[in-house]
């Protein structure tokens, strides 16, 4: 069986442009190259030799004709299959070396093996062995800028051999070197040819071309001279598949390393990109904490009145006039409500402002004439002394229980228990002090108050019996709506008309909580705009990065990177920026929230807003990083390599 050519071209043409503007660069090229040959393709600038090499190296596609590699029709291969072919069978040695400046010599050599899925230990050892064999054993950790031109070209040759290098394309490999380095590179290529590698050398220098056993000359896109093929006698090296255990996890690990290296290479730009994400995340966390703190503060204030309470007030829903001028609630109403099953306590309240006097001190406070069951109904305990009793209420006793603010105002340096104070020219004995309650939902001081028996207050202070409101404590909060309906029916039966209103504190708390939640999320939405702006910043920077690194993308594609590998690399950079920015934003958001809280603003931090803000930052990075990453993945290898 006769040997099969490694490369077979039939009537290959390549034109740039379309229609009448099309410019032919290659015209009907027919060519066979056998395994193990050392071929020099010569021609002046503009002859089409570099275009031919790009087609042979699967960096470009012919406009017409057929290209077979090792018997396989290359035109039938998709982008990823072409990438695998470049990775496993080809090696490129470029005139400008095309080494990645941010990577060491060994890391540059390892690139093809990374995309082949070779195990890290295996590829480290192989790269070191290749570089040592090329006289660079002491330059493994040097970056391209620290190497001479000849040394950089040897690194390029080692990279071409990393996956076996069955076919090596050398495009003007001596064009940027001095004579000594040029001779060294030519010697290396000759040695590789003797070892069985197929070498295709692109040059315009006849002296360089003489080292090849076969010379092909191209002029004006046509093959004008071919010294003839020579059947190989050397053993043909197979593509090196050792150590290739392709792993998705390994792909992500390498993409992460590359992303860290890329971001570190331009710290200032990375910091500016991070800033948008940091501000966005910190703003969301801070605004939501402030909004939730305000909501919780209002709800807590209302809850201090008791969430199991129903407030019955005089005046119908449509009745005009102030509540204080309406006299529709009377003592018999609260007694009737007390008889309803499920009512823990119904207490009357008759309130109004009065001036108190003790010794030479005057103080204005609210007087609340109420029932002895007030502490139970309002869940407001006495901390000193005792509350007045049913007997005190029945006997019209002149006793008083003070709120904390009132007690501190009238008795700053002594205990008020047993002392007497004057209210509306009536002398009351202080028998107790209430626990501190704090501000009401309206911001009023609930502790600036004096409690007296309802009977005493209505007769001796206010001179009236009608009530300002009835507070109803419900035994089972799940029956609030049911008890509210029973109270409504009872009062309707007694009054005949709806000259009262009932307020359900549980419903009020729920309504206010929902309203505050809406405001909280509104604040969060406003803050999220900055997060959106940060995401757009990520996209802008990534687009700039793709433009700046177009040549790097071309180098990676030439060494075997698939579209997925490029997409993965730039997506990883985007989400890494977003993740780092998100974490910093969370820390700053927590710190800012605590500082604001220390200044007296109510705040409430929970894990959900932090997780939400970080998750949004992460998702924003992926979303806005996808377009630049996709653009990078779909670049044409030959155009990317030609980019400056």
From Swiss-Prot:
Its EC number is 7.6.2.-. The chain crosses the membrane at residues 271-291, 526-546, 570-590, 607-627. The keyword Membrane applies. It is found in: Cell inner membrane. Keywords: Antibiotic resistance, ATP-binding, Cell inner membrane, Cell membrane, Membrane, Nucleotide-binding, Translocase, Transmembrane, Transmembrane helix, Transport. It is a multi-pass membrane protein. Disulfide bonds: none annotated. GO terms for molecular function: ATP binding; ATP hydrolysis activity; transmembrane transporter activity. GO terms for cellular component: plasma membrane. Gene3D superfamilies: P-loop containing nucleotide triphosphate hydrolases. InterPro entries: AAA+_ATPase, ABC3_permease_C, ABC_transporter-like_ATP-bd, ABC_transporter-like_CS, MacB-like_ATP-bd, MacB_PCD, Macrolide_Exporter_MacB, P-loop_NTPase. Pfam families: ABC_tran (PF00005), FtsX (PF02687), MacB_PCD (PF12704). One of its GO terms (biological process) is response to antibiotic. Residues 7-245 form the ABC transporter domain. ATP binds at residues 43-50. Its main location: membrane. Homodimer. Part of the tripartite efflux system MacAB-TolC, which is composed of an inner membrane transporter, MacB, a periplasmic membrane fusion protein, MacA, and an outer membrane component, TolC. The complex forms a large protein conduit and can translocate molecules across both the inner and outer membranes. Interacts with MacA. Part of the tripartite efflux system MacAB-TolC. MacB is a non-canonical ABC transporter that contains transmembrane domains (TMD), which form a pore in the inner membrane, and an ATP-binding domain (NBD), which is responsible for energy generation. Confers resistance against macrolides. Belongs to the ABC transporter superfamily. Macrolide exporter (TC 3.A.1.122) family. This is Macrolide export ATP-binding/permease protein MacB.
């Amino acid at each position: 069986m006769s040997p099969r050519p490694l490369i077979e071209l039939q009537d290959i043409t390549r034109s740039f442009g379309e229609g009448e503007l099309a410019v032919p660069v290659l015209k009907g090229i027919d060519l066979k190259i056998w395994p193990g040959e050392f071929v020099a393709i010569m021609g002046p600038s503009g002859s089409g030799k570099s275009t031919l090499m790009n087609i042979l190296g699967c960096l470009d596609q012919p406009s017409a004709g057929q290209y077979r590699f090792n018997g396989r029709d290359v035109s039938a291969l998709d982008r990823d299959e072409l990438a695998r072919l470049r990775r496993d069978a080809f090696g490129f040695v470029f005139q400008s070396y095309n080494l990645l400046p941010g990577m060491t010599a060994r890391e540059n050599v390892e690139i093809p093996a990374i995309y082949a899925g070779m195990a890290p230990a295996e590829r480290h050892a192989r790269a070191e062995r290749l570089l040592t064999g090329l006289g660079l054993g002491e330059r493994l950790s040097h970056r391209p800028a620290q190497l001479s031109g000849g040394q950089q070209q040897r690194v390029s040759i080692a990279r071409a051999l990393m996956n076996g290098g069955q076919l090596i394309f050398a495009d003007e490999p001596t064009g940027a070197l001095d004579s000594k380095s040029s001779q060294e590179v030519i010697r290396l290529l000759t040695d590789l040819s003797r070892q069985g590698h197929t070498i295709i050398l692109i040059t315009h220098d006849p002296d360089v071309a003489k080292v090849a056993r076969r010379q092909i000359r191209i002029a004006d896109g046509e093959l004008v001279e071919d010294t003839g093929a020579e059947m190989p006698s050397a053993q043909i090296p197979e593509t090196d598949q050792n150590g290739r255990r392709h792993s998705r996890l390994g792909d992500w690990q390498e993409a992460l390393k590359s992303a860290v290296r890329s971001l570190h290479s331009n710290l200032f730009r990375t910091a500016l990109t991070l800033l948008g994400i940091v501000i966005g995340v910190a703003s969301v966390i801070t605004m939501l904490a402030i909004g939730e703190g305000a909501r919780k503060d209002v709800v807590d204030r209302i809850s201090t009145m008791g969430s199991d309470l129903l407030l019955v007030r005089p005046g119908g829903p449509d009745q005009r006039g102030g509540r204080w001028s309406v006299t529709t609630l009377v003592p018999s109403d609260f007694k009737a409500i007390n008889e309803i099953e499920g009512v823990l306590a119904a207490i009357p309240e008759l309130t109004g402002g009065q001036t108190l006097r003790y010794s030479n001190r005057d103080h204005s406070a609210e007087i609340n004439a109420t029932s002895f069951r007030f502490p139970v109904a309002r869940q407001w305990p006495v901390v000193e002394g005792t509350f007045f009793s049913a007997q005190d209420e029945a006997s019209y006793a002149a006793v008083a229980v003070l709120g904390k603010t009132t007690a501190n105002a009238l008795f700053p340096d002594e205990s008020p228990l047993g002392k007497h104070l004057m209210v509306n020219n009536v002398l009351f004995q202080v028998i107790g002090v209430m626990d501190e309650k704090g501000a009401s939902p309206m911001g009023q001081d609930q502790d600036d108050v004096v409690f007296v028996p309802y009977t005493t207050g209505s007769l001796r202070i206010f001179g009236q019996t009608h009530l300002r409101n009835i507070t109803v404590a419900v035994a089972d909060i799940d029956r609030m709506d049911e008890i509210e309906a029973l109270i409504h029916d009872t009062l309707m039966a007694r009054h005949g008309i709806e000259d009262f209103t009932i307020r359900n504190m549980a419903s009020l708390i729920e309504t206010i909580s929902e309203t505050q939640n809406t405001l909280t999320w509104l604040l969060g939405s406003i803050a999220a705009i900055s997060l959106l702006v940060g995401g757009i910043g990520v996209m802008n920077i990534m687009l700039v990065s793709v433009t700046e690194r177009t040549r790097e993308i071309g180098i990676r594609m030439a060494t075997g990177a698939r579209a997925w590998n490029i997409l993965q690399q730039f997506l990883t950079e985007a989400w890494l920026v977003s993740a780092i920015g998100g974490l910093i934003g969370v820390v700053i958001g927590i710190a800012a929230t605590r500082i604001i809280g220390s200044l007296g603003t109510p705040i409430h931090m929970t894990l959900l807003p932090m997780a939400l803000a970080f998750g949004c930052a992460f998702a924003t990075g992926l979303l806005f990083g996808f377009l630049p990453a996709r653009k990078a993945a779909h670049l044409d290898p030959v155009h990317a390599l030609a980019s400056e």
